[in-house]
């Protein structure tokens, strides 16, 4: 007989220690998945990165600010073929007043006169109505010196003075009484002149 001891039994007390030390033995017919390790020096990718969002074919992602045709501006859903109701309309025959634009009209009691100057340009002057070259001075623009002036007036004997004198003679007045109408300024013609350049502007006749 040989004096060598028999080999240890595989299921003996040392078997669990070998399994814990070297890991579970590989199962025959199955291979462990290969794990890709990054090359040395490169950081590991974060573990929370998931797959890209799923996009159905033929429907791209909408751009920021794009409103689908079936959605309103406030985000409410509108079924196809639905149109928002129109806003309130004014009653039939009513038209809202538009903005008022004042036109170039003179104020009440005013009158627009056009005075020609020697250069050929037209100057528009607004004077008081009822005092346009009559028996009182008038504010206007001199057509000669082109300055804003108040006309200077002078009285001259005109046709109305002679008519009133002949009327007095016809009524049997004395020779001296028929000269009285020639002394009253209210019966004389009025001549308007420029106080600056002394130029003649207009003559107002009591009787044409």
UniProtKB/Swiss-Prot annotation:
Tissue specificity annotation: Highly expressed in brain. Expressed at lower level in heart, skeletal muscle, kidney, pancreas and liver. Weakly or not expressed in placenta and lung.
Feature: compositional bias, Pro residues: 1-13, 36-67
Subcellular location(s) per record: Late endosome membrane; Lysosome membrane
GO molecular function: zinc ion binding
Domain notes: The LITAF domain is stabilized by a bound zinc ion. The LITAF domain contains an amphipathic helix that mediates interaction with lipid membranes.
Membrane topology value: Peripheral membrane protein
Gene name in the database record: CDIP1
Keyword annotations of the record: Apoptosis, Endosome, Lysosome, Membrane, Metal-binding, Zinc
Predominant subcellular localization, coarse grouping: membrane
Protein name: Cell death-inducing p53-target protein 1
PANTHER family linked to this entry: CELL DEATH-INDUCING P53-TARGET PROTEIN 1, LIPOPOLYSACCHARIDE-INDUCED TUMOR NECROSIS FACTOR-ALPHA FACTOR
Region (Disordered): 1-71
Family designation: Belongs to the CDIP1/LITAF family.
């Amino acid at each position: 007989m040989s004096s060598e001891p028999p080999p240890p039994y595989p299921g003996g007390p040392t078997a669990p220690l070998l399994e814990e030390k070297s890991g579970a033995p590989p199962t025959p017919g199955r291979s462990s998945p290969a794990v890709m390790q990054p090359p040395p020096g490169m950081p590991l990718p974060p573990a929370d990165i998931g797959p890209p969002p799923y996009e159905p074919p033929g429907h791209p992602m909408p751009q920021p600010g794009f409103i689908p045709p079936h959605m309103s501006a406030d985000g409410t859903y509108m079924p196809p073929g639905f149109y928002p109701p129109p806003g309130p309309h004014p009653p039939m025959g009513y038209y809202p007043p538009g903005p008022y634009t004042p036109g170039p009209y003179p104020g009440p009691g005013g009158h627009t006169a056009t005075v020609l100057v020697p250069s050929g340009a037209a100057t528009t002057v607004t004077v008081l109505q009822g005092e346009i070259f009559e028996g009182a001075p008038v504010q206007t623009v001199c057509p000669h010196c082109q300055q804003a002036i108040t006309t200077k007036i002078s009285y001259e004997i005109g046709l109305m003075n002679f008519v009133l004198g002949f009327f007095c003679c016809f009524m049997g007045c004395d020779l001296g009484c028929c000269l009285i109408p020639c002394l009253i300024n209210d019966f004389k013609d009025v001549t308007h002149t420029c106080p600056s350049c002394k130029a003649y502007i207009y003559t107002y006749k009591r009787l044409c």
